[in-house]
Structures are given as structure tokens and as C-alpha cells.
Amino acid sequence: MKRDTKHIRAQIVNKTLNYIYTNIDTDISLDELARLNSVSKYHFHKIFKEETGENIFVKITSIRLQKAANLLITDNYSTITEIANNCGYVSPTSFSKAFKKRFTFTPSQWRKGAFRNFTKNKFDINDKSIKNFEGLEPRIKVIPQKTCVYLRLKGYTEANLIKVWQRLLAFAYQCDLKNNTHIGIYHDSTIMIPYEECNYIAALEVDENFEPKNSISKLKIHESLCAIFHYEGKYGDIERLMIYIYQYWMPKSGYEVITLPAYAVFSKNHYLEENDTFILDFHVPIRVV
């Protein structure tokens, strides 16, 4: 495959996924995604499947259900039907059926606390480990829009994360990008999604007029009100931090999450250090209840 062709295909996938995550509360059609990428429906479907190994409709459903699972935990004021609608479901029945198939529990059971059992089945989590985060309070601040170049990774393992960050830094060196802020974007939560299915974005903040090349793409992190948690830890602690934020802090905070992804701004990036320690500010886009 020619380099230009590979770049075009990567851009199609990246533009598509960014669009889905940003508009997950709407009815997203194949026609719409094909128009977005200026290709036929047939070629779009074929390219997305070949590049990601996933069916586009299965991917959209997975993203909808993950967003709903988060909202059921953090939004105590909306009904289950309203949350389903906010995640693109028109029929409460089809939503409940899909949710139970994905997470074992019904939306009602999940909201009443079954999510804690789901998490404990996936991680070695107990009240003692969560107590390490007690007293951790965020700053609430409006964060301006950021422009980033990035690489997307599917399959959340330490080895793969190190490789994708090293490749992004190699690109930065070739483009004479120096001292750019490192940002990790968490479209998929490892709390709810199997490691091998998670999509992670390694990003560098750049000037708005910077144009990437090769398989590197560009995105915008939209302006939003954020809860910002400053934390220093080691590899594996980010997952526990996310559990604390979404399952313990958020329900009592007077805020709720919105559909924009959370992201970490690294002062010390453990994927590029000799040891596995990090320093970061974890940003969670929110709104007042």
C-alpha cells in the first residue's frame, strides 16, 4: 500500500471515530459517515472494517453503551429513558436489552449499585484501595479548546502504550516539535471495556495551524468545564483514579459527566520514563446538575 493511501485511510478512521464520540447522542447513519469522508458507503464500510477490524455499527453500539453506563452512575437526576435518549437510543426496550447483554445487569440494577460488582469482577478493587484517594478534590475550571496531533491505539497494554508514545515522540523530533504538552485521551474506559477493545489516544498539543503528515492525524479537544484531579502515581493507578472519580466522587459532587472524553495532561509521562511513575492532571468534562 502506498504511503499516501495509508495516510488517507488512517484519516478516514480517525475522523470517523472523532465524529462518533462527539455526536454519540444523535442518530448516526452510514450515509452521514460516508459524506463526512467524501467516499461511497461501500468504500467507507470496507475501509473502516479493514483498518480497525470492527464493524462500524458494532463500534457505534459499543460507544453508546459505555457512555450510558457512565451516565447511569453519575447522573442521578435523569431517568433511564432520558439517559438512553442522550446516548442515541430511541426505544427503552432495545436499550435495556442491549445494556444487559453487554454488562450482564439491567440499567436499573446497574444504577442501584451493580456496577460495583462489575468493577470488582474485573479489577482487584476493594474499599481499602479506594481509601487511598479519599480527600482528593478537583479544581473546577473552564479549559479552552486545544489542538493536538495524535496516534490512536487499540489494545490497552503497557507495551503497546510505550510503543505508541515513542512513535509519537519520534514524529515530534522529525517535525522539530519541542516541549509540547503530552495528553492521553481516554475514549474508552478500561473499567467497563476489555483491554483489547479499548481505544487510547496519545496526543501532543500543537499550534492550530500545524499540519501533520504520514499516519499522524490532528484533532481538537473542545472547550469544556472540567473537574481537574492532580495526582502522582504509578502504572495501574489511573484505572483506580477513574473508579474513584466516576463511582465515588461524581455521584455526590453536584456535577455530572457529559459525553466528551476524559483526558490526562502529563507533567511526567510514565510511558516515556525509566520508572513507571507519573504526574498528571486528569480532566473530566462536566456540567452542573
What positions do the PLM features span?
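Residue-level marker of regulatory loop/turn positions in helix-turn-helix DNA-binding domains and
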Residues: 5, 9, 22, 37, ...
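A generic structural signal for ordered secondary structure
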Residues: 30-36, 55, 69
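A solvent-exposed interaction/effector surface
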Residues: 18, 42-49, 54-62, 66, ...
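Short, Lys/Arg-enriched anionic-surface-contact patches
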Residues: 1-12, 54-64
